[in-house]
Amino acid sequence: MRLIFANIIAIYRKELQSYFASPLAMAIAGIFWLISGFFYVTILLDPQRGILAQVAAQAAVQQELGTPRPPLDVPYEFLQFFLGTVASLSLFILPILSMGLYAEERKQGTLELLATSPVYNWTVATGKLLGVVTFYITMIAPLLLYEAITFSVAEPAFPATIPLLGHLGLILLAASVLSLGMFISSLTDSTILSAILTFALVLFLWIVNLIAANVPGPVGEALAHLSILENYSNLIQGVVDISSLVLFASYIFLGIFLTAQSIETLRFQQN
């Protein structure tokens, strides 16, 4: 067991270092930060649809009609919009981050060596997944500064449990997509094809609840449960939904399992 953990950590470090040394990965991170900052300002300060504009409009209506209305929960509304936007942006970024996990190895001819090594296939897959998930966490970590600025002026103080659950949901969402993308990457030596197929799969899992709404009976209900958007929305609303946690965990383990089986097939072919 100790050897297994040592192998996972070694692969994890190698994978993480490769991302920080990759110009493409760093360029993606820079673009992600730039776009996220733009949306942060837009969500708060847009003169027509920004949250602060909504607060001002609500105050004007109350003053004109003289009828009190429940005040707009600015931190909560901001968190919903911001984390929803970050998740939508991640939909385009995550397939690019996962596309080279195995496709690059296959392209360079090192995947055959990896497949015939004495290291367990699931160990390699787990180490690679942890590496890319950690890189994604470093990408979203600076966004906490935006949220801290917003929450610092909240009266009364905004409870920390809601943003914590929201970020847990974002990490689980990313890990699910990256795990499934890792499996797709193990099937081809084309990083571009891997990214396209992963994006198509994620898009399906993103909008499957819309498809389920038009499918009657148990099949529609089953499809609705597969939606990563619906389950992510539960967490960013501060709702601890065990079924959502189970779904994300299932996607993560499914991706690792299928990746291990894909490499095992290659190992069998080599033998």
Residue locations for each model-derived region?
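Aromatic- and glycine-rich beta-strand/loop motifs that create alpha-glucan
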Residues: 1-29
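Secretory targeting signals
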Residues: 38-41, 70-83, 126-189, 240, ...
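Terminal transmembrane helical anchor/hairpin motif
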Residues: 5, 43-76, 194-262, 266-270
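Hydrophobic/aromatic residues in alpha-helical transmembrane segments
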Residues: 94-98, 110, 146, 179-180, ...
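Transmembrane helix boundary and interhelical loop/hinge segments in multi-pass membrane proteins
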Residues: 95-115, 129
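Hydrophobic alpha-helical transmembrane segments of multi-pass membrane transport/permease proteins
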Residues: 23-53, 88-93, 200-204
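Long, hydrophobic alpha-helical segments
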Residues: 74, 78-104, 139
